[in-house]
Design a protein with these regions (language model features):
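Gly/Ser-rich helix-loop-strand patches that form or flank binding pockets
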Residues: 3, 96-148, 266-318
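Extreme N-terminal leader/targeting regions
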Residues: 40, 44-47, 51-65, 79-88, ...
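Conserved long hydrophobic alpha-helices within structured protein cores
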Residues: 102, 106, 142-157, 188-192, ...
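Structural beta-alpha unit
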Residues: 1-3, 16, 23-26, 73-108, ...
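Small/aliphatic-rich secondary-structure junction motif
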Residues: 1-54, 149-216, 243, 301, ...
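General small-molecule cofactor/ligand-binding pocket signal
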Residues: 36-38, 82-86, 137, 190-192, ...
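Hydrophobic alpha-helical membrane-association signature
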Residues: 20, 64-67, 170, 174, ...
Length: 322
């Protein structure tokens, strides 16, 4: 499946060929896509240096050009790459480039901690997750290549809710991307749907006339409804990505019961997942309501790379002008 045609890779000033750049080049080659490398530098206030602004700017540009040259040289035998240096707030300049050039994927390297706070998202990472209109792939520096295991997170939405169409579109995008990457990388493809029986805690509290048998029957009914929905979604996935691709990746489903922000990160750790594909939007069409509480909780608890997806009608609060 050739989904991506215009990829933007966010480089840093080191010039090191990171795993993220390997993935960017490989994906661009496989998709016959355009690949642009962008390096954003913050403006340095004049009062922080004794050098004239012009001399300092030239020194920094020369350093960044050398870093870009290393990346372009590494990839020269496989494809031609465009490169640019921009000055300003990095996330703003990256999102503006996406808007101006209609990018369909942003790839960036990130890093993790080793303690209880698993993710060490930079400020730029979080801004991109919240505000970039196209999918954002944040790649852990130690992620294996090729990717071994992918986890796609899908969510059930009440068909009568005003967000039902958006949820369906988002689920399709998530499954198509996960399926395509699993096919290309030869990865295991896992699909997770976390569910809860609303009202279970009250029913088990002993303060109602509902007995244990009725409670268990209710929970089982809810489980069957969610299982039926997930089964139907898999049938749709087969049509969306094609029977040949579907049979090649043979998705494995998981339906843990519990709070998604807890059970999804736990499952990702148990399965030793390398990449989580998930939606991040709480509401669409309203700038400012850009990332759901559950999504942010999941992002803060997982230890692997993330491909964050937003629906087509997402509206970024970033404008092309300051």
């Amino acid at each position: 499946m050739k989904r991506f045609k215009n990829i933007l890779y966010v480089a840093d000033s080191s010039g090191i060929v990171l795993k993220a750049f390997h993935h960017a080049v490989d994906l661009a080659v496989r998709n016959d896509a355009r690949l642009t490398v962008i390096l954003a530098m913050e403006r340095i206030p004049p009062y922080l240096t004794r050098l004239t602004p012009y001399l300092l700017q030239q020194a920094r540009i020369e350093e960044l050009e050398a870093a870009l040259d290393k990346l372009i040289e590494w990839a020269a035998s496989r494809m031609k790459i465009e490169a640019k240096i921009v000055e300003g707030k990095p996330f703003l300049e990256i999102v503006r480039d996406v808007l101006r050039n209609e990018r369909d994927l942003v790839i960036k390297s990130t890093d993790h901690g080793d303690g209880a706070m698993d993710w060490l998202f930079t400020s730029t990472d979080m801004h991109l997750l919240r505000k970039c209109p196209c999918p954002v792939w944040l790649i852990k520096a130690s992620e294996p290549a090729p990717i071994r295991r992918i986890l796609a997170c899908v969510d059930f939405n009440d068909p009568d809710s005003p967000d039902a169409a958006t949820a369906e579109t988002l689920n399709r995008m998530i499954l198509e991307m996960a399926g395509a990457l699993a096919d290309v990388q030869g990865s295991e493809c896992h699909i997770v749907h976390a569910w809860e029986a609303i009202g279970e805690q009250i029913m088990r509290s002993g303060h109602t006339a509902i007995d244990d048998e009725q409670t268990e029957a209710y929970i089982e009914q809810v489980r069957r409804e969610h299982q039926g929905w997930l089964d139907r979604l898999l049938s749709q996935m087969r049509r969306w990505i094609g029977a040949e691709t579907y049979d090649a990746v043979t998705p494995k489903t998981h339906m843990p019961k519990g709070n998604p922000s807890k059970v999804i990160p736990a499952l990702a750790r148990d399965l030793n997942i390398d990449l989580v594909v998930m939606g991040t939007v709480a509401r669409t069409g309203v700038p400012g309501f850009l990332i759901g509480n559950t999504a942010e909780s999941v992002l803060n608890r997982i230890r692997c790379s993330v491909l964050a997806v937003k629906p087509p009608d997402f509206v970024t609060p970033v404008s092309l002008e300051d």
